[in-house]
């Protein structure tokens, strides 16, 4: 409890089954003023870009999965992009004093969330 200055989580959040419990656990182990930095992928907010992104990632991820003989894993990655609601909605329900979410990358499908305890 209150043990860590910062917690960093990159590209695994879509695989966490109970994100509310995970947010609470990270909050518990962070020192006061500590930061939880979360980097992951989602679908774009813009409806048109979301359609383009879905088509593009379907083709690209299934192609890469086929070439690398990891079709199951890349199919999961494609499906996982739709599993959670938009991070601006999903991550705003927590005990942290400050939350900043910034979208980066082409189509804004990568997001960076910084939570402060």
Task: Map each language-model feature to its residues.
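C-terminal alpha-helical "lid/dimerization" subdomain adjacent to the S-adenosyl-L-methionine
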Residues: 39-93, 102-103, 111
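C-terminal beta-strand of the catalytic ATP-binding
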Residues: 115-117
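A short glycine-rich, Lys/Arg-flanked "PGG" loop and its adjoining helix->strand segment in the class I
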Residues: 20-35
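Conserved hydrophobic/aromatic "anchor" residues
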Residues: 4, 96-97
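Short catalytic micro-motifs in class I SAM-dependent methyltransferases
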Residues: 11-12
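A short acidic, Gly/Pro-enriched loop at the edge of an enzyme's catalytic core
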Residues: 1-7
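Conserved Rossmann-like nucleotide-binding pocket used by diverse enzymes
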Residues: 8, 37
């Amino acid at each position: 409890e209150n043990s860590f200055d910062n917690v960093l989580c990159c590209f695994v959040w879509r695989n966490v089954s109970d994100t509310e419990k995970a947010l609470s656990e990270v909050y518990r182990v962070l020192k006061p003023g500590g930061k939880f930095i979360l980097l992951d992928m989602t679908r774009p907010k813009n409806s048109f870009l979301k359609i383009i992104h879905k088509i593009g990632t379907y083709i690209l991820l299934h192609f890469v999965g086929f070439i690398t003989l990891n079709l199951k894993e890349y199919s999961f990655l494609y499906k996982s992009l739709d599993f959670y609601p938009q991070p601006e909605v999903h991550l705003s329900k927590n005990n942290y004093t400050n939350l900043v979410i910034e979208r980066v990358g082409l189509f804004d499908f990568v997001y960076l969330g910084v939570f402060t305890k």
